[in-house]
Amino acid sequence: MQRRYFAAYRNKKLENKDFTIISNNCWAGMIYESYNLPKMSPTIGSFFMPDDYLRFCKDIRRYLTLELSFIEPYESKYANKLSGNERFGTYPIGLLGDVEIMFLHYHTADEAKVKWERRCGRINWDKTIYKFNDQNGCTPANVIDFFSLPIDHKLFFTIHKEWPKINDDGFYIIEQKANANEITTSHEPFGSNRYFDLTKMINML
């Protein structure tokens, strides 16, 4: 509620309003809503497993030329890992080459594909932020790989204070009382707060 209530105020602080966020989870959509902006990212309403997200980001332009297809939940290479979640099997799973995309907030594959293709056409490659976090079995090794990617404007959020701070620029430890294993999307920062100033980062793109 707070995220959307102050959206108009945050929007006035923005100088760049045509940015793209490539996120490993639903954070991108939350950010566009928090600024009351059109969604300029295909990763809205979906999530990637860590290895697939890193693979996708490393060669994103090639992956986005591939035809998005869909598989049954039992065909997912992550079926055993995700089957314990009650929502597994209720959402479409997309496939771009060897990368799986979990379209968590979509009801059908057709809906997911239409919005994916439409938003791919909105990507602003000159103003792109890549956001990763500690969800879905992410390890410190994954974080090292993320900050080693040949891309600019990287953000990483974690609740793990014991993890080594891989990078002084873009690595943020977030306090969270609930769920001690990984950060929840609702706890990831937006706007300007005590962790960092996203508005400032966007304006500097």
Task: Walk through the language-model features, giving the residues of each.
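Adenosine ribonucleotide-centric catalytic and binding domains
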Residues: I22-N80
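Structural motif
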Residues: S23-N25, H105-H107, I129-N136, T158-H160
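Structural alpha-beta junctions
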Residues: D51, N124-W125, I144-I173, A178
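A short acidic, amphipathic alpha-helical/loop segment
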Residues: R118-R119, P140-F146
